[in-house]
Amino acid sequence: MKVVITVVTCLFLLSVMQLSFFNIFNYQLLDATTNGSKDSRKSKDKLLGGLLTADFDEDSCLSRYESSLYRKPSPYKPSRYLVSKLRSYEMLHKRCGPGTEAYKKATEILGHDDENHSTKSVGECRYIVWIAVYGLGNRILTLASLFLYALLTDRIMLVDQRTDISDLFCEPFPGTSWLLPLDFPLTDQLDSFNKESPRCYGTMLKNHAINSTTTESIIPSYLCLYLIHDYDDYDKMFFCESDQILIRQVPWLVFNSNLYFIPSLWLIPSFQSELSKLFPQKETVFHHLARYLFHPTNQVWGMITRSYNGYLSRADERLGIQVRVFSKPAGYFQHVMDQILACTQREKLLPEVFVLETQVTNTSRSSKLKAVLVTSLYPEYSEILRQMYWKGPSSTGEIIQIYQPSQEIYQQTDNKLHDQKALAEIYLLSLTDYIVTSDSSTFGYVAQGLGGLKPWILYKPKNHTAPEPPCVRAVSMEPCFLRAPLYGCQAKKVNITPFVMYCEDRITGLKLVDSN
């Protein structure tokens, strides 16, 4: 009898061991398959649907290929035509960029102002020079605008490196550099290119030194284009078709701009067909260009990933609130705080707070963690939110966690660490699920476009009073061209073109929308 019991017991244990081994084997196989599919998905995602090239060393710029691990896959896919155009541009930049014989020859003509460059061959290499002016948000928007203009006109874009641009962004083009060499012949003159400069296009038109309507104009070796918010009607002629015909012949263009002027490029007839092929979804222009161009350096990427992993990654939902106060003096204002609360609670982005614990009737219904990222020069806005959700329970039972990475008090453009913090915060905002931005803020424009987010825009307060309604949901994620040329050669097109509209936060501005 004992022998029988022993045999039965052994058989039972053997079957259990076999079953366990079978389950372990299946689990390992499933895990390997799952990991394999994850790895495959990651390898596809890291190039963002072909937007990025694989021709870079990954360690030199971690953010380029790691960003897809921190961001939900974009529902907006780049067109094949855009992908092809970017690869063609990269090859052109290699042939014409700094250090090439073509670049050397192109710089040599800058000293010969007495020659008419409409009759001289400069080959395939023509250039755009970007001058760094105003704050980081403005700079990113103008870089995107200039790069698109470079794509449309087959030019090479080179950026002024006398500021901290190389401390913020990796090189975007493989096997070459986008940095304007410090020995560029016009370096000492770049800061003097203002709206009164005799080499700026608007001034030359005003002084009859150049004429876009005749074929008799002498084409200079370079022109300054002044597209700052205070530009005049002569400067705005840049957006006219006949003027573009003349400007295309100039070998070097130096841009002084603080505006996102892409919407008005769509209203230039000769560009419209090409733009439609590049961006069938018109509100994706900045979204695609930003993800292609702007990859934070490893130092900035470290700031971003540490903040994300420490404060945002565990949340079930992430909300970004970008607060920019344009009042003078700026700082904390109660009416701005009231407006933030009115907007976020009315739009169900944040729950209300109960005074008494007993008012919460459904605490088990939702124990979701909602992380709220606040970016502001001032600490008071996030601190009041933090205290509010600490003192009383939320009406939904959600746990609300408030995080503000920095409180700089003053904007310190061209201070390396300040700008790096600003870029990190822009990027963190773009990683949220929903975003609230401030009226006319370029900082917010960049974050929403990079993240593919349609923001709730806080209207600008008047007379120190919270506006009613406090905010509006944007129609598209595109930034606003805050000072668009609404009159002159584009006046009629503004009103009849279905894919441009006046901005929600600036009646003098234009933005791109999908016409449907």
From Swiss-Prot:
Membrane-spanning residues: 5-25
Pathway: Protein modification; protein glycosylation
Pfam families in the record: XG_FTase
Lumenal side: 26-516
Keyword Signal: no
BP-aspect Gene Ontology terms: cell wall biogenesis; cell wall organization; protein glycosylation
Assigned GO CC terms: Golgi cisterna membrane
Tissue: Expressed in leaves and stems.
Annotated membrane topology: Single-pass type II membrane protein
Enzyme class, spelled out: transferase
Family: Belongs to the glycosyltransferase 37 family.
Protein purpose: May be involved in cell wall biosynthesis. May act as a fucosyltransferase.
The name this protein goes by in its record: Probable fucosyltransferase 8
Native source species: Arabidopsis thaliana
